[in-house]
Amino acid sequence: MSISKSLVLNEIKKFSPSHIIIGYSGGVDSSVLLNISKELDIPLIAIYINHNLHRDSLKWQIHCQQTCQRYNLQFISHSLDKVPKGESFEAWASKQRMAFFQKIMQPYSKPLLLLGHHQDDQAETFLIQAIRGSGLAGLAGIPHYKELHHGGVLRPLLKYSKIEIEEFAKLNNISYIYDDSNEDIKYRRNLIRNQIIPILQQVNPNIGQTLSRSANICAESNNILQKLLTERLQSISQDTNLIISELIKLDDDIQKSLLHLWFKQNTQQSLKSKQIKELHLAINNPSTGWQIDISNYYQIHIQYNQLIIKYPTTINDMSKEDIISWLSKNLNEEIDLTKIVIRDRKPDDKCKYRGRNKPNKLKILFQELQIPTTERSKAKIILKDQQIIAVYPFFICG
């Protein structure tokens, strides 16, 4: 199937965007998308994100800028900082790119972000998610269209293969850059693209199309499931709380799915399989006062007949600044603020006070250090990598 320029243009037009933002890397996918989209009578902004990883990244930026000048289009470049230690570059960079796109989209009434993902990207994503053991939502892969906080993101080339995109570029004399880092198999996606997909093509020459179709089926099935679960969730909820006696009337699998959906809707975060199992066990043997930590930010409590999410305590900027300043003075090491979490004290919090071999509950330490009860309420727990490293403004742990 060859790319139909008119179909792609009509697909974009049906969203009636006030402005079009294109993620433009200079690669063949985004170059073809830019070439097609420039024919629309809609203000268009091309954005180049410089990841500062490749020796030629500045050359690519200049290529993109010159192409936009030739097309008479607005061009914006943005340079990413160094990825924080311990974070996946791919996941971090994806978040950074989307955050910048949203920043550019913010002033416009109905902006539409266009990205050049294609069928081969979808096939690779399906395999990545399958390897992770993902469920329907993960296997659904890359969405064709998705609402964003402001505007939406559309991938008009998602049904076309990489070969079809390259053929379009050749027929239309579209110049583009080639990123040789795509051959580096230390990245999982490159390993799948360059080594696993070719093996699968020996079994099924149309493996890209087949896996993409499977992703679409998963997406459709997941949409149906989410609609049905959302309706059921509304019937067993009171405000943002879950009514336990109503939830446990349902089949176990439905209970677990509703627990996942309930938490996702209220926090925009996902529960891990282990956490869902713990929650499921707890609601079927409910005990008032039971609680579970879900990351450093959230707790889930059972209070009488309801399951309740405890949200993070808001610490104003001045208080946080004071806490970080205190930590810097008392902790003899460099602090990576991206890994620091500050929260209120919990009953079971423990700290290994300096010079001791094992941790003690904070209540015991407060008593031993003769910290007045009236002062203890001021305590803020400082965590790094989910470990308590200090109790502000009293002492350092570890």
UniProtKB/Swiss-Prot annotation:
Transmembrane segments: none annotated. ATP binds at S25, G26, G27, V28, D29, S30. Keywords: ATP-binding, Cytoplasm, Ligase, Nucleotide-binding, tRNA processing. Its EC number is 6.3.4.19. One of its GO terms (cellular component) is cytoplasm. One of its GO terms (biological process) is tRNA modification. Its main location: cytoplasm. It catalyses: cytidine(34) in tRNA(Ile2) + L-lysine + ATP = lysidine(34) in tRNA(Ile2) + AMP + diphosphate + H(+). InterPro entries: Lysidine-tRNA-synth_C, Rossmann-like_a/b/a_fold, TilS/TtcA_N, tRNA_Ile_lys_synt, tRNA_Ile_lys_synt_N, tRNA_Ile_lys_synt_subst-bd. It is found in: Cytoplasm. Gene3D superfamilies: HUPs. GO terms for molecular function: ATP binding; tRNA(Ile)-lysidine synthase activity. It is an enzyme of class 6 (ligase). Belongs to the tRNA(Ile)-lysidine synthase family. The N-terminal region contains the highly conserved SGGXDS motif, predicted to be a P-loop motif involved in ATP binding. Ligates lysine onto the cytidine present at position 34 of the AUA codon-specific tRNA(Ile) that contains the anticodon CAU, in an ATP-dependent manner. Cytidine is converted to lysidine, thus changing the amino acid specificity of the tRNA from methionine to isoleucine. PANTHER family: TRNA(ILE)-LYSIDINE SYNTHASE-RELATED (PTHR43033:SF1). This is tRNA(Ile)-lysidine synthase. It comes from Francisella tularensis subsp. novicida (strain U112).
